[in-house]
Amino acid sequence: LGTYPLYAKQLTDVLVMAYEEGYRLIDTADNYYNEKDLGESLYYIYNQLGAKREDFFLVSKVSDELYPIGDYRAGSNRGVYFWKSSRIMQSPNAVREILEEKIDNTLRFLKTDYLDLWLMHWPYPDFFLEIWHEMEKIYAAGKVKAIGVCNCRVRHLKALRDQGLSIPMVNQFESSPLNTKEEIIDY
């Protein structure tokens, strides 16, 4: 169940209906800004419907926080973090510190001590390899059971392989009759 753009009572109501219909995979992202509400909704379901944490497969994504430059509809957003021009990224440990903070916030907001799947929301060009390497470390530490990527093309997966990094366990991407993504599926 995708949770964007659901918040507060609407999110709880949808989640209760979805749970009663058998939904168990819940998908969110830190830049949907609904992880706290989702945690409260899950807490409600645990207490009111007798569900357990283990009943759900929780997915979240590590994302950049965007701020608009000019007309956002023209695709002129720029990220706060994962750009070389960002002042935040000048520290040599910036990627590690940001990812550790993001996963810890996600776990706290969702009221859980682990995530079933953590995805990199986009292949951020300036820090793609570094982000993935830090995600591998967080996976090894046991905070997440699986790691993956979103919206990656073959060239991104080859870059990981060529650097000796692990291949993502999941690559979430859009596919439809009009947008078949045959190359990535074949890969």
Language-model-derived ranges and their functions:
Residues 2-9, 64, 81-97, 126:
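Active-site mouth loops of central-metabolism enzymes
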Residues 8-9, 104, 120-187:
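Beta/alpha (TIM)-barrel catalytic core signal, keyed to glycine-rich beta->alpha loops juxtaposed to Asp/Glu
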Residues 70-90, 178-187:
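Glycine-rich, positively charged active-site loop/lid region within alpha/beta enzyme cores that binds
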Residues 1-60, 66, 70-76, 140:
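N-terminal binding-site loop/beta-alpha segment at the start of enzyme catalytic domains
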Residues 36-47, 103-107, 135, 157:
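Short, well-ordered amphipathic alpha-helices
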Residues 1-2, 26, 56-60, 115-120, ...:
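Hydrophobic faces of well-ordered beta-strands that scaffold small-molecule active sites
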Residues 97-119:
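CE4/NodB-like, metal-dependent polysaccharide N-deacetylase domain
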Residues 44-54, 110-112, 138-143, 163-167:
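Short helix-capping segments at alpha-helix termini
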